[in-house]
Design a protein with these regions (language model features):
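Rieske [2Fe-2S] iron-sulfur-binding domain
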Residues: 47-170, 482-485
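Generic structural signal for secondary-structure transition and capping sites
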Residues: 35-39, 86, 209
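Short Pro/Gly-enriched beta-strand edge/turn motifs at strand-loop
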Residues: 37-49, 122-127, 295-308
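N-terminal flexible segment immediately upstream of the FAD-binding catalytic core
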Residues: 1-12
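Short linear motifs in intrinsically disordered
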Residues: 43-50, 131-133, 363, 377-380
Length: 486
């Protein structure tokens, strides 16, 4: 049996019980206490651009329809019929004004309102037997959008999304706000790996240390302008709000010179200068750092890199990828990976950038193959009895007395928010695991049961207890998510 208190205490001092990367009890706790109340990325507005467009996304075992209703509002609806629980939408994406349950034919508008109930009067006695008026598919308890990125939380009392993101918004803008019209996404590609979901999130958050070993061959074949993987140590790791990542150190030059070095054409540079704040521009132009990989707690990551795309050419071209580490079990993860690009970029640029993404971080990408080999091995090894005796050292960057090996950069040295250091460390991985431990330490309040189609007062009377809320009632559904009466 897992001693959860001991696990949490060890993680809080930077020592990592190896078995947390393949432990069924830990995973059950994660499902309840972490994924049951965190903000989780599910889609981007560009995936549902028109009224009626939808995609279906999963949060662990829960399926949600992310739709744009007829008024243009984004909805996140639990994909479960109010009658007998059948999924009302079985396609991954499409366009529909209504969703019809294939079991008994109940139908719902794309804003969630029930509009069709066969034999309502004959079978239920009309409204007296089943109150159809005002009933909706269950909306996600909390929904928030930032730069077109759609997040949901299963916690109705979740803090506002932008408060949760905090200063990490500063860095998210580099990936998602390169022009006034934002980005568009292609994908997602999906694949499964026999690895624990936390490993990928940690790797993208701040592990520059693995690059010279794991990815040496990719760098030394000449895919990048930087001739040696060891150059990663000249970049920084930063942590801000609930996310963190890494940067590359760029050669000397002006803002424009440095953005051209990364491969951005002048018209895109012009749009960046219009959209990014002076502080964001200074990180690149004055300080000489460009964002690379990053992770937002708990399971969302970003990648920004600039390989050579065309054979025989010295020119590089940047790509951006967004991905989600979707847990399947304690030892399996579904990776969802999107290609992201400035909506206003030329079609030629989009095509070459997509090629760069597939080459490096698509399902068959060179970096992906290197990384997955490590992650699968770690997960397998963590399952054994010997792993339960081992506390892995996650304290890189700290002396034994807790003092920093390298102090954070000052405001004169670095223009961005958060805590930023040059060189190898595990500060960011610790920050992720500290938040992980904090969630696992705090119990989740049980959610109220929802009664479908009957008066809450009557439900309480029948049950002989307090009245329970009904689906669509103000007690359980945020006002912003409630549908109008049919």
């Amino acid at each position: 049996m897992t001693d959860q208190t001991s696990v949490i205490q060890d993680v809080q001092r930077g020592m990592i019980p190896a078995h947390i990367y393949n432990d069924k009890e830990i995973f059950e706790l994660e499902k309840e206490r972490l994924f049951g109340r965190s903000w989780l990325f599910v889609a981007h507005e560009s995936e549902v651009p028109e009224a009626g467009d939808y995609v279906v996304r999963r949060v662990l075992e829960d399926s949600f329809i992310i739709s744009r209703d007829e008024k243009g509002e984004i909805r996140a609806l639990f994909n479960m019929c109010l009658h007998r629980g059948m999924q009302v939408c079985r396609a991954e994406m499409g366009n529909a004004s209504h969703f019809r349950c294939p079991y008994h034919g109940w139908s719902y508008r794309n804003d969630g309102r029930i509009v069709g109930l066969p034999f309502h009067k004959e079978a239920y006695g009309g409204e007296e037997g089943f109150k159809k008026k005002g009933q909706t598919l269950l909306p996600a308890p909390s929904l928030g959008i930032y730069n077109g990125l759609i997040f949901i939380s299963l916690d109705p009392d979740a803090e506002p999304l932008e408060d949760f993101l905090g200063d990490f918004k500063f860095y998210m803008d580099y990936y998602t706000k390169q022009s006034a019209d934002g980005i568009e996404l292609r994908g997602p590609q999906r694949w499964r790996v026999k690895a624990n979901w936390k490993i990928g999130a940690e790797n993208f958050a701040g592990d520059m240390y693995h690059t010279p070993q794991t990815h040496t061959s990719v760098v030394e074949i000449g895919l990048f302008r930087e001739p040696k993987a060891e150059k990663r140590k000249d970049g920084t790791t930063y942590w801000a709000g609930n996310g963190g990542g890494t940067t590359y150190k760029l050669p000397e030059g002006s803002l424009e010179d440095r953005l051209r070095y990364v491969g951005y054409p002048d018209e895109m540079i012009g749009r960046m200068k219009e959209q990014w704040t002076q502080q964001q521009l200074d990180v690149v132009g004055k300080d000489g750092f460009m964002v690379s990989a990053a992770s937002l707690f708990p399971n969302m990551s970003f990648v920004h890199n600039w390989p050579r795309v065309e054979e025989g050419s010295d020119e590089v071209l940047p790509f951006i990828s967004i991905r989600m580490w979707q847990p399947i079990s304690e030892n399996e993860t579904e990776v969802l990976s999107w290609f992201a690009v400035d909506k206003n970029a030329s079609e030629e640029y989009k095509a070459l950038s997509y090629k760069a993404y597939l080459m490096c971080f698509g399902s068959g990408g060179m970096f992906e193959q290197d990384d997955v080999e490590n992650w699968v091995s770690l997960t397998n090894t963590a399952a054994g009895s010997m792993a339960r005796r081992l506390l892995l050292n996650g304290r890189m960057g700290l002396l034994e007395d807790g003092q920093n090996v390298v102090e954070p950069l000052t405001a004169k040295e670095y223009s961005g928010p958060g805590s930023t250091r040059i060189g190898y460390s595990e500060y960011n991985q610790r920050e992720l695991l500290f938040r992980w431990a904090d969630h696992l330490e705090r119990p989740v309040q049980a959610a109220a049961q929802l009664h479908v189609g009957i008066d809450p007062v009557q439900a309480g009377a029948v049950a002989g207890g307090d009245a329970a809320p009904s689906v669509g009632s103000a007690a359980t559904v945020p006002a912003a998510m409630m549908s109008q009466e049919a």
